[in-house]
Amino acid sequence: MDEKQLVSQALSAAIDGVLGVEQIAAIIEKPKSSDLGDLAFPAFQLAKTLRKSPQIIAGEIAEKIDTKGFEKVIAVGPYVNFFLDKNATASEVIREVLAEGEHYGDANIGEGGNVPIDMSAPNIAKPFSIGHLRSTVIGDSIAKIYEKLGYQPIKINHLGDWGKQFGLLITAYKKYGDEATITANPIDELLKLYVKINAEAKEDSEVDEEGRQWFLKMEQGDEEALRIWKWFSDVSLIEFNRIYGKLGVTFDHFMGESFYSDKMDAIVEDLENKNLLHESKGALIVDLEKYNLNPALIKKTDGATLYITRDLATAAYRKKTFNFVKSLYVVGGEQTNHFKQLKAVLKEAGYDWSDDMVHVPFGMVTQGGKKFSTRKGHVVKLEMALDEAVDRAEKQIEAKNPNLENKEEVAKQVGVGAVKFYDLKTDRNNGYDFDLDEMVSFEGETGPYVQYAHARIQSILRKANRKVNIDNISLVVSDAEAWEIVKALKEFPNIVKRAADNYEPSIIAKYAISLAQAFNKYYAHVRILEDDAQLDGRLALISATSIVLKEALRLLGVAAPENM
């Protein structure tokens, strides 16, 4: 039973049901210091009803309450403070973790409901830069968290493969491009063309118009325009898939903006039939004044569609195809207004399922405080950064454990894991500066630090070479270090739920850091392998810790090496 539930039931019985179990659970607090107990109930809530001071009420409850399952229950001023029975709690938690293994913390909250997750979405014909990392790893982690809670996540890569920029790129290719040069080094050469043509289009309106015309041809199904565009797309996907392989990220569907190019007319017609489209300076808009939003521009004066038109078609397609219970968009915070408009247009059109669409924004990655910009050519390729991280990890592993057999494989797990973990430990709405030195460090709040704690436990268990009987676990919790681990293990299922509720993988990452820190304190304080009556209990405790550390890392898409 959950510790809050245990306390709430005992309290409700002690006060003769004046407050229900759920009401009590909602106001239970954690004392600031563990010396004051594990949980505390503020008696202020009962003062008015019982017509007594909170201090007197707390004292009466402490005397009356059934202390089964608790070491002690005491009144501290206006609070009733509960100290859990450490030994019983430890045995129960450890037994549960060892019995359930990687499934500890699983739940069926989602009951198999579909959750499409729009994530990653790099632009074709451009490098896969560090700027694309966040959407990719946050989306992947949320998918794993939701799957653990019984949902059916559907990871969709909504590639940026449609729009006027491709008309401009075709213009550049026709003017300056060479097929053989591009084939030899596709992304770099296409980037050069993209930067060159953007600079020209800013200075020369005729170049900009030519790009617009090529995109219009794409939308109208022009054979030459689509052939060149398809070639750009194919060479880009080869590069992207190689990088996804290094990241260990897979997708259920690659559905770029182009996939919806033949589905937009239906949504525009629907808006027209519902009298939602209004003409403004030759363009078609939806008025969103009642939502305190600017009008949504649905079609330009030349008939070309826009980003929001494609997203309207996308949303309708996903509802029809997946009948989602939630539809998540892991897209940067700068798109917040766009998603407000998108949901408002769908709401106006009578699609109440738009309430189940959630924009999951995130902060920006910078380098040296500067934003990455493909248009200006300021790009740091993610693949190069990952390779550098692996090299740095290998050097550190070489220094720590020169005889490690599978050094290269472990270096990949540590280097790539370090980059992913650093991103995911950052609160989603905050940005961060990309710093490999900090990421790949084995000290501090990093992925390698957590991985090393897991590997150290595995090393101890191999050295012990002893099978622990799950049915006969008895751990005397005589030190604060062991109790901190037990409390952390007990909290893991709630941590997973909280991460899901907030679409926040950093909750898992920070938990993994604190659990690794708790183990390292225990390791420094206790002789784990001492051959005494408590040996099996200690081995069971660290084995359970290893299981939960590994599962926390898995939910972040990070490997847990057995050796480091």
From Swiss-Prot:
GO biological process, one term: arginyl-tRNA aminoacylation
Listed EC numbers: 6.1.1.19
Enzyme class: ligase
Reactions that this protein is recorded to catalyse: tRNA(Arg) + L-arginine + ATP = L-arginyl-tRNA(Arg) + AMP + diphosphate
Subcellular location field: Cytoplasm
InterPro entries in the cross-refs: Arg-tRNA-ligase, Arg-tRNA-synth_N, Arg-tRNA-synth_N_sf, ArgRS_core, DALR_anticod-bd, Rossmann-like_a/b/a_fold, tRNAsynth_Ia_anticodon-bd
Gene3D superfamilies the record matches: Arginyl tRNA synthetase N-terminal domain (3.30.1360.70), HUPs (3.40.50.620), Isoleucyl-tRNA Synthetase, Domain 1 (1.10.730.10)
Pfam families linked: Arg_tRNA_synt_N, DALR_1, tRNA-synt_1d
Alphabetical UniProt keywords: Aminoacyl-tRNA synthetase, ATP-binding, Cytoplasm, Ligase, Nucleotide-binding, Protein biosynthesis
Protein name: Arginine--tRNA ligase
Taxonomic source organism: Lactococcus lactis subsp. cremoris (strain MG1363)
Lineage: Bacteria, Bacillati, Bacillota, Bacilli, Lactobacillales
Gene from which this protein is expressed: argS
